[in-house]
A protein has these predicted regions:
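Active-site helical microenvironments for divalent-metal-assisted chemistry
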Residues: 2-276
């Protein structure tokens, strides 16, 4: 039988191993652990090169969100869905599409089960942020079980947004969504739904955020609120080789076009054709 956990801010998991150890300490069963591990493997592929606006690896944010939900709720599909909560909006699927397409939903379902997939879809569909969070708060008493679960995932996401002063390290914290009014709604929503541990973590995260001052040398400006991708050096080198090859091909095409034009002109005027490339590889008239 899984147990709930008291989760200090400094013990929120940031890696898969830390998350697994947390779940083992909470006595999660093997089936539940396997479901979470399957979700992590898919998340690792979808977010391998994505970073947060503050340059925190996105996979660490997903793990932290899952860690918070696991401390509050012992349902494996909720923790698995927390690992994949941004899959349909920010995951790198490589299909050129957007949102929860049937093909993407099928992949998530195969990796983490239908209950997990439904939660990820519901998370994606729930309006959240400036104004919307207050709207959820006004109808908190009328939320059904699934909506309450998705709100828990949203609140866990908020914990990691604010934890470690994360919003101080980029200009994402300047958005209205992270203003005092919305922060108050988030805190009150956690309390009204009885998510005591999440409410405590939010309180601590807000306090740390308020007390932290970050120098300009560590602050990332002009970022997309969803973060971005960082290509590995090996990929950049391969791209450089390909670009150079394409440039060489372009030069060859232009040389060929000039020779053809010269030959056509020579036929018309009776002059000899234009310059040719020698058999030694030297270029003339380029």
């Amino acid at each position: 039988m899984a147990e709930s956990a008291v989760l200090p801010m400094d013990r929120i998991a940031q890696t898969n191993l830390q998350l697994y150890c947390q779940l083992l300490d909470q006595r999660w069963e093997d089936r539940a652990l396997g479901l979470v591990a399957g979700a992590y493997e898919l998340a690792l592929r979808l977010f391998a090169v994505r970073v947060r606006p503050n340059r925190k690896p996105f996979i660490c944010h997903l793990v932290a969100t899952a860690s918070v939900t696991a401390a509050e709720c012992d349902r494996a599909e909720v923790t698995a869905a927390s690992l994949l909560h941004a899959a349909y909006t920010l995951g790198d699927w490589g299909d050129g599409k957007h949102g929860a397409t049937p093909q993407r939903r099928a992949v998530v379902e195969r990796a983490a089960g239908p209950a997990t997939e439904r939660l990820v879809t519901s998370y994606t569909a729930m309006a959240w942020g400036y104004g919307a969070t207050a709207g959820v708060l006004t109808r908190a008493a009328d939320l059904d079980d699934d909506e309450r679960t998705v709100v828990l995932m949203r609140l866990a996401n908020e914990v990691d947004e604010w934890a470690d002063g994360g919003l101080r390290f980029s200009d994402k914290g300047d958005y209205p969504r992270f203003g005092a009014e919305n922060a108050a709604a988030v805190r009150e929503l956690a309390r009204s739904l009885g998510y005591v541990r999440v409410a405590e973590l939010l309180d601590e995260a807000f306090r740390r955020h308020a007390a932290l001052s970050v120098p300009r040398s560590l602050r990332i400006e002009g970022t997309d609120p969803g973060g971005g991708r960082v290509a590995p050096q090996s990929r950049l080198l391969r791209m450089g080789v390909r670009i150079e090859s394409e440039r060489d091909a372009g030069r060859a095409l232009r040389r060929g076009a000039r020779r053809l034009a010269g030959a056509v002109q020579g036929r018309r005027t009776g002059a000899s054709p234009g310059p040719r490339q020698s058999t030694t590889g030297e270029h003339h008239g380029d």
